[in-house]
């Protein structure tokens, strides 16, 4: 990721922000991110279409090639959504200056909803025809987002995710809230997924944000030649808007997941789920999680009810509760969870005594795009192999990073491989018992 790429999001935001004064922030974020989503969906579709045309050019007649290029099932089988003509970006752009462009965009969304009800129903609000923007405003945004160059393959999806993360943080700040960790850095999601050796089974993220862990898991399966249908995806997200973004993120990959909107603290949507893999990046040190609203004898908190002023061990116990007998968990956690005393210290002691922790990696600072708090990667397993019994592997990786800007560090591929080598016993632990 180059420095010039990082300034691109800022330029895009400043350009899009010019119209924000015309519309309420809670509506404008849907307008902007909905358009970017439509833009990317068409981009991915057109790239796949070009690939088909080039491949089939010498084998079939023009009419037959056209028929193949309009085969909906072919695109879905290849991890891309087929986009009907009147929902395509070219059609929207061609009509950008029409007085009814808002209706045209709403109709495009409805077409996609009808085509993919499980993935997209009610995900993008159809508000374009009723907001306080005229055709000139829409033309400005459409032309602006037409300039986004997504690149190729996984890089294209990285750019999409980065733009979404950046805009999510900006819109959250504009609403007077603290910017959240909606998009976990890919260098972290990829490392956790590799260490857990995610393959077939059930993967669960109860604080799924925009779905970054799911994407890294799906990409790992693709690299290893495993069909994505072998991995069942479950996620819960407390913020309605971010829940919608996660649904979009899976949709652009042609994946159906069971993603539900709700508060994991008090409304566990997957109470009976026992997952093979739990991956997560929960809110750090949440001081207003609602301890007084926890029901008596909640089975998740067998090690004790965490304090009101910090939810770190709410999440850790939530993960333990949802693990299958041979399940594995890998998650990002604020460093305070390693040293908190009083109730937290007692809970941590009991978890260690039950031999559930099998590894912790101390990460460098500034790994998150919008949050600078230091963090560690935790790895849990309910059933350790014999050689890991009574042991916890600690890896100090605080100096293992590449600075890509003043405010963000990343793990490079070399750093990831070094971490994987150092944590080989963790990978072995995940491979021995399957």
What are these model-predicted stretches?
Residues 1-199, 258-269, 362-365, 387-398, ...:
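Non-catalytic, mostly N-terminal accessory regions of nucleic-acid modification and defense proteins
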Residues 2-3, 268, 272-434:
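A conserved structural/catalytic subdomain of Rossmann-like adenosyl-cofactor enzymes
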Residues 18, 148, 166, 170, ...:
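Conserved, well-folded catalytic cores of nucleic-acid-processing
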Residues 29, 33, 234-235, 329:
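Conserved RecA-like ASCE P-loop NTPase motor core of nucleic-acid helicases/translocases
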Residues 178-280, 285-289, 294-302, 313-314, ...:
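Conserved S-adenosyl-L-methionine
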Residues 39-52, 171, 221, 225, ...:
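A generic secondary-structure signal for well-formed alpha-helical elements
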Residues 7, 11, 238, 311:
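Soluble or luminal CAZymes and related metallo-dependent hydrolases
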Residues 85-89, 246, 378:
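Hydrophobic alpha-helical packing residues
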């Amino acid at each position: 990721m180059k420095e010039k790429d990082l300034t691109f999001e800022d330029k895009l935001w400043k350009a899009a922000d010019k119209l924000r004064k015309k519309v309420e922030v809670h509506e404008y974020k849907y307008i902007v991110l909905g358009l970017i989503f439509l833009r990317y969906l068409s981009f991915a579709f057109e790239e796949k279409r070009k690939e088909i045309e080039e491949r089939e050019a010498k084998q079939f007649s023009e009419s037959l090639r056209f028929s193949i290029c309009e085969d909906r099932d072919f695109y879905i089988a290849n991890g891309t959504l087929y986009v009907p003509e009147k929902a395509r970006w070219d059609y929207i752009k061609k009509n950008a200056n029409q007085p009814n462009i808002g209706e045209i965009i709403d109709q495009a969304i409805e077409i996609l909803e009808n085509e993919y009800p499980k993935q997209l129903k009610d995900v993008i609000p159809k508000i374009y025809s009723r907001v306080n923007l005229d055709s000139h405003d829409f033309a400005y945004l459409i032309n602006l987002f037409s300039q986004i160059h997504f690149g190729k393959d996984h890089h294209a999806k990285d750019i999409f995710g980065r733009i979404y993360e950046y805009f999510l943080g900006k819109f959250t700040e504009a609403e007077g809230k603290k910017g959240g960790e909606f998009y976990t850095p890919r260098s972290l999601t990829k490392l956790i997924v590799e260490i857990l050796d995610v393959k077939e089974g059930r993967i669960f993220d109860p604080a799924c944000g925009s779905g970054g862990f799911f994407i890294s898991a799906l990409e790992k399966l693709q690299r290893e030649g495993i069909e994505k249908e072998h991995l069942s995806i479950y996620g819960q997200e407390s913020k309605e808007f971010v829940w919608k973004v996660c649904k979009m993120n899976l949709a652009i990959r042609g994946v159906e997941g069971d993603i539900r909107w709700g508060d994991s603290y008090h409304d566990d949507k997957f109470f009976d789920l026992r997952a093979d893999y739990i991956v997560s990046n929960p809110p750090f040190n949440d001081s207003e999680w609602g301890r007084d609203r926890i029901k008596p004898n909640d089975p998740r908190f067998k090690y004790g009810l965490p304090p009101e002023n910090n939810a770190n061990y709410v999440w850790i116990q939530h993960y333990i509760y949802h693990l299958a007998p041979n399940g594995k968990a890998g998650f990002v956690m604020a460093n305070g969870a390693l040293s908190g005393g009083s109730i937290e210290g007692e809970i941590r002691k009991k978890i260690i005594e039950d031999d559930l922790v099998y590894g912790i990696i101390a990460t460098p600072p500034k790994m998150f795009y919008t949050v600078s708090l230091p963090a560690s990667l935790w790895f849990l397993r309910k059933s350790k192999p014999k050689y890991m019994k009574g042991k916890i592997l600690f890896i100090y990786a605080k100096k293992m990073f590449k600075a890509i800007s003043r405010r963000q560090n990343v793990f490079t591929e070399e750093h990831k491989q070094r971490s994987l080598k150092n944590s080989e016993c963790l990978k072995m632990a995940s491979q021995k018992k399957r």
